[in-house]
């Protein structure tokens, strides 16, 4: 589903990429960074919780040295306890959902983040979670959530021309006629795309946990 939404956005963005959209707009000088950390409710072996927790903690310390404020949303009992113990109060925290995430939590996170970014409370938003590569291997993923870049709305490492898109396996390019304009359609699709990215991270982390 996430891939399908991304392909749809690739078609729309190819017709009209409007950098003034709230989720695409850059804020200039970076003053506030928000991390969305997805880990586990359980104390799992290895670095499942420790790896992303320490990464976010070190990044927050590095930003503080540069005079940049930072905060974190914690998804999972362990990261919530980790930062609370270190006197860092999460901007939001979710406990008891790591094994069975649902769209309600994803919507709450996405709405909070999108509203905060649009109002200028955050200048950059970073997502950190585990990707279930296969049954025995997981990969820690760190990616920028906001601002959404032009590259994120295209197929990975591929140009976005109609000719190039038509050659990508599983991607069919159609020369759409937009009503309303592609810029307006893009503005309507971006929030749905953003919610999908959040929910995908919660599901991916749950799969990696198991």
Feature-to-residue mapping (PLM):
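C-terminal beta-strand-loop-alpha-helix "lid" module of Rossmann-like NAD(P)-dependent dehydrogenases
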Residues: 1-210
């Amino acid at each position: 589903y996430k891939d399908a939404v991304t392909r749809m956005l690739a078609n729309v963005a190819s017709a009209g990429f409007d950098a003034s959209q709230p989720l695409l707009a850059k804020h200039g000088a970076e003053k506030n960074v928000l991390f969305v950390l997805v880990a586990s409710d359980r104390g799992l072996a290895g670095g499942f919780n420790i790896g992303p927790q320490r990464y976010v903690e070190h990044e927050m310390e590095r930003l503080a040295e540069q005079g940049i404020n930072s905060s974190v949303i914690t998804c999972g009992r362990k990261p919530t306890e980790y930062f609370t113990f270190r006197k860092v109060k999460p901007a939001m925290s979710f406990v008891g959902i790591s094994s069975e995430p649902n769209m309600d939590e994803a919507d709450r996170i996405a709405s909070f983040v999108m509203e905060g970014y649009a109002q200028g409370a955050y200048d950059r938003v970073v997502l950190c979670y585990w990707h279930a590569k296969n049954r025995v291997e997981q990969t820690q993923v760190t990616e920028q959530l906001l601002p959404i870049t032009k590259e994120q709305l295209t197929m990975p490492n591929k140009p976005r021309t109609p000719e190039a898109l038509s050659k990508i396996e599983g991607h069919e390019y159609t020369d759409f006629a937009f009503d309303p304009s592609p810029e307006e359609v893009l503005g309507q699709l971006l929030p749905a795309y953003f919610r999908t990215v959040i929910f995908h991270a919660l599901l991916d982390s749950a799969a990696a946990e198991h």
